[in-house]
């Protein structure tokens, strides 16, 4: 029996990776059995630039709720936000991230955060890897024919992979 962060499964754990944003929220759902990764679904929640911000948050919330209902993840992994310049953008992305975390919290689904360095280290084996290296390794690890598009979906899958690897050593 596999036990990951308190979730006992005979065969697998389902992880929802989220790449937060307010224009695009990347998501990736994968199953992990302790050895193998099986990509279930990935994509992006898109919002229109000319839509009022509160309506964008509402749209993100509704679409993420649908993802939770459809795929029933056991855990959510999200990349920790890091911004060095535009505070307005950082605040807006943080609010969109909060909407996604709320969907997990409503279901008592644990949420784990990973820094970009942790994601790169987990997926590529090198914490200073370039974005294209992370995307290519994500494709290879998951056995996909092509790099997931949009990039936000690949980032979300990388966060889910990171969680599966970290949870092996913390459970």
PLM feature segments, named:
Residues 1-171:
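Phosphate- and other anionic-substrate recognition elements at nucleic-acid/protein interfaces
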